[in-house]
């Protein structure tokens, strides 16, 4: 793991673009650690192995023009809108025990605090604002 973290924003609200951007960074990046930030507009993101039909209310998402996309990683279904900021950490470290999540969340929390926002790292992978 290097001391430097490369910061990237997609600049897009399109969930398909944002997930593809994340995948491209993962596969084509040079060595180093990366922090990606993005927002999706009215989207349900389902995990790689989930049954999307079982996770969503099709009539509701269609009536409210909510997009449904699938990510290439596991985990549960989540709803994204412009009220939340999404982030990914991509690192060279293959050793889970060497990967301290605090190394990635600390700069984000400090930046938010620098903007005058009360924030803190919480749980395994959340930053509360």
Language model: regions and residue ranges:
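Short, conserved charged micro-motifs
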Residues: 54-56, 95-100
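Long, well-ordered alpha-helical scaffolding segments within enzyme catalytic domains
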Residues: 97-114
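Beta-rich nucleic-acid/ligand-interaction surfaces
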Residues: 121-129
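Short beta-strand
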Residues: 35-39, 78, 118-121
């Amino acid at each position: 793991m290097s001391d430097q973290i490369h910061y990237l924003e997609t600049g897009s609200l399109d969930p398909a673009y944002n997930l593809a951007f994340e995948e491209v960074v993962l596969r084509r990046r040079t060595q180093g650690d990366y922090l990606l930030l993005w927002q999706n507009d009215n989207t349900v993101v389902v995990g790689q192995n989930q049954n999307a039909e079982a996770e969503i209310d099709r009539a509701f998402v269609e009536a409210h023009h909510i997009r449904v996309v699938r990510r290439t990683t596991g985990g549960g279904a989540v709803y994204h809108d412009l009220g939340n900021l999404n982030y990914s950490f991509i690192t060279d470290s293959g050793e889970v025990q060497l990967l301290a999540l605090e190394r990635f969340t600390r700069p984000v929390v400090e930046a938010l605090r620098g903007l005058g926002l009360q924030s803190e790292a919480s749980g395994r992978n959340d930053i509360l604002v």
